């Protein structure tokens, strides 16, 4: 336990919280070609690679992912949620934060139903998360 005098000389440091989705906290000024620290909830980007990835132990699957170059010139790996997708190279996508527990290095999700990404077909429940319109009665 420090004495009062020690705390006066050198106060306690508060913990610095690290961002879980750092690429969303960086903006880009294209006129000055300089990065700014303007954060945003989502970012637009262009898919540079679309493929599948195997998850960590003990899970087994082929998880769909896309490598995306964001509008702030940062390149990140993003997960494509839902069954089936229409993404290919040069597709324009919208990214949100949120990591995938069993895919190392994947810290972002692609928003379904926004920009070039189509919603999930034949989805009846939880449609808003997958960009699916309400089915006709």
UniProtKB/Swiss-Prot annotation:
Sorted alphabetically, which PROSITE patterns does this protein's record hold?
RIBOSOMAL_S12 (PS00055)
Statement: the UniProt record of this protein carries the keyword Cytoplasm: no
SUPFAM superfamilies cross-referenced by the UniProt entry: Nucleic acid-binding proteins
Q: Which GO terms describe its cellular component?
A: small ribosomal subunit
Residues bearing the modification 3-methylthioaspartic acid: 102
What does the subunit section of this Swiss-Prot or TrEMBL entry state? Part of the 30S ribosomal subunit. Contacts proteins S8 and S17. May interact with IF1 in the 30S initiation complex.
Q: HAMAP family from the entry?
A: Ribosomal_uS12_B
Name of the molecule in the record: Small ribosomal subunit protein uS12
What organism is listed for this UniProt entry? Streptococcus pneumoniae (strain ATCC 700669 / Spain 23F-1)
